[in-house]
């Protein structure tokens, strides 16, 4: 029997937080794992087999589940874990193939309207934070905080840059641009996002060319992000919203402090080991000044938090593995359907 993940994209080609989190979760399982996704050819990545999903449009949540169900039957799927745009097709295909369906939920209902029907109809949902589980109406559901990469053996705080790991508008690129103008003697690194053409600034390169201390750098695979962390003094995450904040935790492993937008979900991750702010220029600047006023203390707090989170992660992955190994089809799916429906009625 096989565990099958279904996602619109998958590492190493798709390296956004949701895809990376799904991969690290699936890679932790001892059973055979296959992922169906958008890919030109089949491949294997860190022990996970990856195949082309049989659907013409991986970004269409209303894609026909029939062809996917046939794939699941061929793979002898026991459990199907779907997320994002392919969440509903994954649930319906799993049902047709006689497999158990699980939705990997990494956003609160406000930002997850498109997957609402999938969450309602699935056999189970797994949430990325306790706050998210409560907002979806399942406070007792399984919570698996997004796994981070192994933290380094020692800290590295010799960098000089204020770094933001995304160039998108919703990640606060405008805030960072204004900060670079405010601190002309400080180095700023902006790591570009592949979604920049649709969700970024059309004239970012022109803007950066007029700000000498603002550097644009290419996106790298998760295993190479250390190249930027080694150059970073403070990580900046002035996003409009964050549903967890993996990058801050990854940076914390290096002893790099962070100025981070404050949300209930972020508090379950980096939490108060970062300076939590509203996503504005003034608040982010205040956060920078606070860290610089006592850098060593903030660095040590960041590293300590990363170590604690890594221990929690090990425990959660063990529980998740045990759950997958023993999961059975629910005897009464309607109980969670009713709970999720009521909790998310206003966002549906």
Region annotations inferred by a language model:
Residues 1-42, 348:
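N-terminal subdomain of nucleotide-sugar transferases
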Residues 82-87, 105:
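Short His-centered aromatic/hydrophobic patch
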Residues 150, 156-206:
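Conserved catalytic-core segment of nucleotide-activated headgroup transferases in glycan assembly
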Residues 240:
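Aromatic "clamp/platform" in nucleotide-sugar-dependent glycosyltransferases that forms part
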Residues 257-260:
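Short hydrophobic beta-strand element within catalytic cores of glycosyltransferases
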Residues 274-282, 289-295:
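Conserved acidic donor-binding segment of nucleotide-sugar-dependent glycosyltransferases
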Residues 293-337:
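A charged, aromatic-enriched C-terminal amphipathic alpha-helix characteristic of glycosyltransferases
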């Amino acid at each position: 029997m096989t565990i099958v993940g279904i996602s619109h994209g998958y590492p190493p080609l798709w390296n956004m937080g949701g895809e990376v989190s799904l991969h690290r979760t699936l890679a932790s399982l001892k059973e055979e794992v296959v992922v169906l996704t958008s890919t030109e050819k089949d491949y294997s990545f860190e022990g996970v087999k990856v195949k082309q999903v049989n659907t013409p449009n991986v970004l269409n949540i209303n894609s026909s589940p029939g062809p996917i169900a046939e794939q699941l039957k061929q793979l002898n799927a026991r459990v199907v874990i779907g997320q994002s745009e392919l969440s509903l097709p994954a649930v319906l295909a799993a049902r047709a193939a006689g497999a158990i369906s699980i939705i990997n939920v990494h956003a609160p209902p406000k930002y997850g309207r498109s997957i609402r029907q999938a969450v309602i109809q699935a056999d189970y949902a797994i949430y990325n934070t306790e706050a998210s589980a409560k907002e979806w109406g399942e406070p007792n559901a399984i919570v698996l905080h997004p796994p981070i990469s192994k933290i380094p053996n020692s800290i590295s705080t010799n960098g000089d840059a204020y770094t933001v790991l995304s160039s998108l508008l919703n990640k606060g690129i405008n805030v960072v641009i204004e900060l670079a103008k405010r601190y002309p003697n400080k180095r700023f690194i902006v790591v570009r996002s592949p979604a920049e053409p649709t969700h970024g600034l059309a004239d970012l390169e022109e803007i950066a060319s007029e700000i000498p201390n603002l550097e644009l750098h290419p996106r790298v695979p998760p295993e190479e992000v250390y190249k930027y962390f080694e150059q970073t003094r403070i990580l900046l995450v002035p996003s409009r919203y964050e549903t967890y904040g993996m990058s801050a935790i990854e940076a914390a492993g290096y002893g790099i402090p962070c100025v981070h937008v404050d949300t209930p979900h972020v508090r379950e991750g980096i939490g108060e080991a970062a300076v939590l702010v509203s996503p504005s220029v003034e608040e982010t600047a205040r956060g920078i000044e606070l860290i610089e006023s006592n850098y060593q203390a903030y660095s040590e707090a960041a590293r300590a938090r990363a170590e604690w989170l890594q221990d929690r992660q090990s425990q959660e992955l063990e529980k998740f593995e045990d759950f997958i190994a023993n999961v059975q089809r629910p005897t009464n799916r309607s109980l969670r359907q009713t709970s999720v429906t009521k909790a998310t009625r206003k966002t549906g």
